[in-house]
Design a protein with these regions (language model features):
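Extreme N-terminal leader/anchor segments
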Residues: 24-115, 314-315, 322
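Short coil/linker segments at helix-helix boundaries
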Residues: 61-72, 79, 83-105, 125-178, ...
């Protein structure tokens, strides 16, 4: 079997991490990674304490609860932005020309805005979805992405996508200097999260903890921010062992789906469904996993990631290696 560069690196990383797991306890590993992480002012001890139990998801309990219709988001999606999201998740972008067409329309809509904060966040969304379209993959950390070697994420694709995620992060940081807004923090969390897929392990160790930290800020400002709520929880669903918390993260995601005070866009639903499906996948509960990935196909019948995961699960049920 021919080994690609990515698979060789992944195999080497698995060996390294396996050695570390035998050499130290879970708490010791967490402390080591927190020590090496760039937390940008976040307290490592606070993050360690918040990492146990479901209370870490209750970061927004003091935020005002209002129905989404009564509390509009600080940067509404433009029509062009929604079209880009829908085209990506609906698998309607088949080539670079189509990708650029949606991207340029989104950028044009942003440049027509007079409010600088809104303009920057809208540009960040355009850059994020451009990078995401290039990768056509799940929101997984680079470490956990090791077992998805059949995805289209080659090193060259990662580099291209990562440049757009970098751009989105810069735009969010510029916007947040103007205004501490909920959509700014949730968009930043989302961009960092996908950059953890595109970049190397050192990037994950330095920046991974910023995802939840920024998502918590988003939800503290606007409890109804569905993306923010999702990003607070998502790392526990997608993180590699021993950091994943499959049952508690799934319970928290189901709670988000049931909360009438949380605004969930159509394209946010597919992210939540995918994360719930992934928790069942990691537990080898194949039928339950397929059930949730099928929910994505009810929204987006041609969704690439859901179809890919269903095929992967069906192959594993049949005893095939993939």
């Amino acid at each position: 079997m021919k080994m690609t560069g990515k698979k060789i690196i992944s195999a080497a990383l698995l060996i390294v991490f396996a050695g570390l797991l035998f050499a130290e306890s879970e708490d010791e590993m967490k402390k080591r990674i927190l020590k090496n992480a760039d937390l940008s002012g976040e307290s490592a001890s606070d993050l360690m304490a918040a990492d146990d139990g479901e209370d870490k998801y209750a970061n927004s309990k003091n935020a005002p609860k209002r129905l989404p219709s009564e509390f509009p988001r600080d940067v509404p999606y433009t029509k062009a932005g929604i079209d880009f999201c829908e085209a990506h998740y609906g698998h309607k972008i088949f080539n670079e020309e189509g990708r650029k067409r949606y991207y340029e329309a989104s950028v044009k809509a942003a440049e027509e805005m007079t409010d600088e904060y809104s303009k920057l966040i809208t540009l960040a969304r355009a850059d994020y979805y451009y990078g995401l379209s290039i990768m056509e993959s799940f929101d997984l950390t680079s470490l956990d992405n090791m077992d998805l070697g059949d995805t289209k994420t080659t090193e060259s694709i990662n580099d291209r996508a990562g440049a757009y995620f970098d751009k989105a992060i810069d735009e969010c940081n510029q916007a947040l200097k103007i205004k501490k807004g909920s959509d700014g923090y949730s968009t930043l969390a989302q961009a960092i999260s996908m950059n953890c897929t595109a970049k190397n392990v050192s990037y994950v160790l330095a920046n991974g903890l910023k995802v939840r930290a920024n998502a918590k800020k988003a939800v503290a400002l606007d409890y109804s921010n569905g993306l923010g709520q999702f990003m607070v929880i998502a790392q526990d669903a997608y993180a590699p062992w021993p950091f994943c918390k499959l049952k508690s993260s799934r319970k928290a995601l189901l709670r988000v789906l049931d909360d009438k005070y949380i605004r969930i866009e159509r394209f946010d639903y597919q992210m939540i469904y995918a994360a719930i499906g992934y928790t069942f996948y990691k537990q080898k509960k194949w039928d339950k996993a397929i059930e949730w990935y099928n929910k994505i196909l009810e929204l987006y019948p041609q969704n690439f990631a859901a179809r890919q995961m269903i095929k992967k699960i069906q192959d594993r049920k049949a005893g095939k290696k993939n």
